[in-house]
């Protein structure tokens, strides 16, 4: 089952929609967070495989206290920014000090994707899960579409096939049609 493979929290987050915070994996405790109505996500998925085992293998076993403090501060600020609909606080808090520096090496053109997305107006850009998808959050659909074009240009230049998806944050989760 998904739970026995350690993926239960992933599937539950996908079913709930929106932003979720996994407070505990055992027992599973997931908190749903509100998000601003104008928040839009752009996701670019390079057609490459990054195995979860490989993505986990590059993670460091130990953290420096400064990294943990910075990451925790950014998480708290992100939750606050979402709650207060403070886009500038969201922008300042979308910095990953722990996972992104090592996992970004597994994703072709990651740094250029991030730079161009942010230059195009993204609030912030990061790795979705264990990769290889890269997400960018934007205020409004117009900016999100510009961000998508900027990211696509990077992969066009380095000849990496990709899919792109742009959507408002779905706070409702999965629906049966």
Predicted regions mapped to residue ranges:
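Single conserved hydrophobic/aromatic residue that forms the stacking wall/gate
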Residues: 1-11
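Active-site glycine-rich loop that binds ribose-phosphate moieties when present
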Residues: 5, 20-34, 62
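Short coil/turn connectors at secondary-structure junctions
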Residues: 8-9, 16-18, 37-40, 121-123, ...
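A generic local secondary-structure boundary/capping motif
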Residues: 9-12, 28-34, 79, 124-125
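Short beta-strand segments
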Residues: 13-17, 23, 43-47, 127-129
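Active-site rim beta-loop-alpha module in soluble metabolic enzymes
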Residues: 43-105
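Glycine-rich, charge-dense phosphate/pyrophosphate-binding loop(s)
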Residues: 82-177
């Amino acid at each position: 089952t998904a739970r026995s493979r350690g993926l239960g929290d992933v599937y539950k987050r996908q079913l709930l929609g929106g932003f979720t915070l996994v407070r505990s994996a055992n027992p599973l405790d997931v908190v749903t967070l509100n998000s601003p109505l104008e928040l839009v996500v752009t996701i670019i998925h390079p057609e490459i495989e990054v195995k979860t085992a490989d993505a986990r293998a590059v993670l460091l076993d130990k953290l420096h206290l400064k990294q943990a403090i910075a990451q925790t501060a950014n998480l708290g600020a992100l939750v606050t920014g979402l709650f207060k609909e403070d886009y500038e606080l969201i922008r300042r808090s979308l910095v990953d000090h722990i996972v992104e520096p090592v996992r970004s090496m597994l994703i072709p053109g990651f740094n250029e994707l991030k730079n161009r997305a942010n230059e195009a107006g993204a609030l912030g850009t990061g790795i979705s899960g264990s990769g290889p998808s890269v997400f960018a959050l934007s205020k409004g659909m117009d900016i999100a579409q510009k961000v998508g074009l900027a990211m696509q240009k990077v992969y066009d230049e380095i000849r990496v096939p990709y899919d792109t998806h742009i959507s408002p944050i779905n706070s409702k989760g999965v629906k049966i049609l």
